[in-house]
Swiss-Prot record:
It comes from the Bacteria. It catalyses: 2 D-alanine + ATP = D-alanyl-D-alanine + ADP + phosphate + H(+). Pfam families: Dala_Dala_lig_C, Dala_Dala_lig_N. This is D-alanine--D-alanine ligase.
Length: 310
């Protein structure tokens, strides 16, 4: 849709929601809402709850800007509802969202696309999980299959830490991913209109890029562009676009990598609804490409559509 067309529509900014990332989503949504108002759009902020279908009807929402993170927002659930209601929305469709949110299925898609992933093993609730079952050695990373923002993630360096890490991860999911720890630089690629904008390097103050480092000022250094040799920089941009396509993503995303000294690019995940807060990385990458926050929001909105063919 064109800007002129969109300015005749009622834009619902979907935010908050029911996931462990609710507070982050409220910040993303507030920033997006303010940007749309500043550009003259008829926009309403909607804190998503289980009555969201009735709210969308009551508010006469024509187009949805999804600023949700985590379950029910980033996993295909809200996308499916919007498809049924015939409300065009921003970001990826049902299948791509569900695949990206499930780290296990996403890894399988990445492997099929010949992208590099860390060795891993899946455990389900009720399994007798033991380090002896792994085909790789400590340290390892333990994470829930379907949470974002590093919720429930632990680095295990000693065998005595494994049980507690698994217990913590199982608080959030029935399936747990145990990955080989890869030593490398945290590099994240911003995708807009299905093309790589650039890559940013993250240097956390803590041992790894955890929830606090992502959302607390001063807890991580952001280096843009990432400090990589030119050919390796181009390689990680291509890998970001390949990962975005491998899951069938639409419009925009953020693709997270670990890049080793040897030049290997290990993909961690694709975020189909990346953060839009003051500390968020996609807006920072966009600024580095000359795209201000309001412009970024407007370009994301312009790509809003229904993804399931009629």
């Amino acid at each position: 849709m064109t800007v002129d067309e969109l300015k005749t529509k009622k834009i619902g900014v979907l935010m908050g929601g029911l996931s462990a990332e609710r507070e982050v989503s409220l910040k993303s949504g507030a920033a997006v809402h303010q940007a749309l108002l500043a550009r003259g759009y008829d926009a309403v902020a909607i804190d998503v709850d289980r009555d969201i279908a009735q709210v969308l009807v009551r508010e006469w929402v024509d187009v949805a800007f999804i600023a949700l993170h985590g379950r029910y927002g980033e996993d295909g659930a809200i996308q499916g509802l919007l498809e049924i209601m015939g409300i065009p929305y921003t970001g990826s469709g049902v299948l791509a969202s569900a695949l990206a949110m499930n780290k296990i299925f996403a890894k399988q898609a990445f492997q099929a696309a010949r992208l590099t992933v860390a060795p891993y093993k899946v455990f389900c609730r009720g399994d007798k999980a033991a380090l002896a079952e792994l085909e790789f050695s400590l340290p390892v990373v333990v994470k829930p299959s379907q949470e974002g923002s590093s919720v429930g993630v632990s680095i295990v360096k000693k065998e005595s830490e494994f049980a507690a890490a698994m217990k913590e991860a199982f608080r959030y999911d029935r399936e747990i991913l145990v990955e080989q720890f890869i030593k490398g630089s945290e590099v994240q690629v911003g995708i807009l209109e299905d093309k790589a904008l650039g890559a940013i390097e993250i240097v956390p103050k803590n041992e790894f890029y955890d929830f606090d480092a992502k959302y607390s000022p001063g807890m991580a250094e952001h280096i843009l562009p990432a400090r990589l040799p030119a050919e390796l920089y181009r390689k990680v941009l291509r890998a970001g676009e390949d990962a975005h396509r491998a899951l069938g993503c639409s419009g925009y995303s953020r693709v997270d990598f670990l890049v080793t000294e040897e030049g290997a690019c290990y993909i961690l995940e694709v975020n189909t609804l990346p953060g839009m807060t003051d500390l968020s990385l996609l807006p920072e990458i966009a600024r580095g490409s000359g795209i201000g926050f309001e412009d970024l929001v407007e370009r994301i909105l312009a790509a809003a559509a229904l993804k399931i063919s009629q």
